[in-house]
């Protein structure tokens, strides 16, 4: 598997299982995503995030003590 530097799967895999729905909802709101499919496309890094989007994603993960977010 190749590494995708725009993917935030690394951070996602560090989340406690009981927090994934909450974090998904928050990221979808921050990025104004309407469907889970678009969320997973973003999580896999198929679309490069804007700087403001990357900062939002980092801030959300940081609240859960996760700082190593990008790549997978």
Question: What do these predicted ranges mean?
Answer:
Residues 32-35, 65:
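Short alpha-helix boundary/capping elements
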Residues 29:
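Alpha-helical residues within the helix-turn-helix
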Residues 3-4, 32, 61:
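Non-catalytic effector/regulatory segments
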Residues 34-49:
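Recognition helix of helix-turn-helix/homeodomain-like DNA-binding domains
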Residues 51-68:
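DNA major-groove recognition helix of helix-turn-helix/homeodomain DNA-binding modules
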Residues 1-26, 66-71:
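A short, Lys/Arg-rich alpha-helix, primarily the initiator
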């Amino acid at each position: 598997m190749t590494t995708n530097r725009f993917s935030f799967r690394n951070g996602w895999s560090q989340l406690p299982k009981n927090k994934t729905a909450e974090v998904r909802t928050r990221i979808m709101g921050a990025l104004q995503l309407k469907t889970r499919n678009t969320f997973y496309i973003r999580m896999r890094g198929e679309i490069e995030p804007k700087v403001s989007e990357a900062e939002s994603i980092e801030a959300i993960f940081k609240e859960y003590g996760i700082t190593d977010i990008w790549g997978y």
